[in-house]
Amino acid sequence: GNFHDCQELEMLYKNHSQIPNHCRFFHTDYYTASMVKYSINTFLAMKVTFMNQIYKMYSDHEEHSRNPHPEIWRAFTDMLSADLRVGSSHLQVPGPDGQYGYGGSCLPKDIKAFIGYDKNERLSVLRDVELANTQIRLTGDSKPK
């Protein structure tokens, strides 16, 4: 929206909500805000899909397939998340719903919307992620049968 409206909305949030004082506010237009939201959620969907594929590859290794302990995987993800560029979110396999791949209401909806919005098909990686996740959710494996 316009700068004045954004400032007023920011003050309303700061003065009448539980938003912490350290929360950053960005004044931008609707298109940019939408692109940020879809970019974040589709990136997280890619991260979940990637981690599920890594999990399968890791657990298929003969040493770990004989002894697949959750503690070993947790130590692996702890090492990954120690790199601040990776971070600790969306590394859990299976996910918080106890299933493999991403689910819930946001990530599947947003990746479909972003793919649909991409009329020039620049985001082909998202189509691959959606296909892999569908396979993971159905079978627990990212390889087509």
Predicted regions and their residues:
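Structural/interface elements that position substrates and couple domains in central-metabolism enzymes
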Residues: 1-145
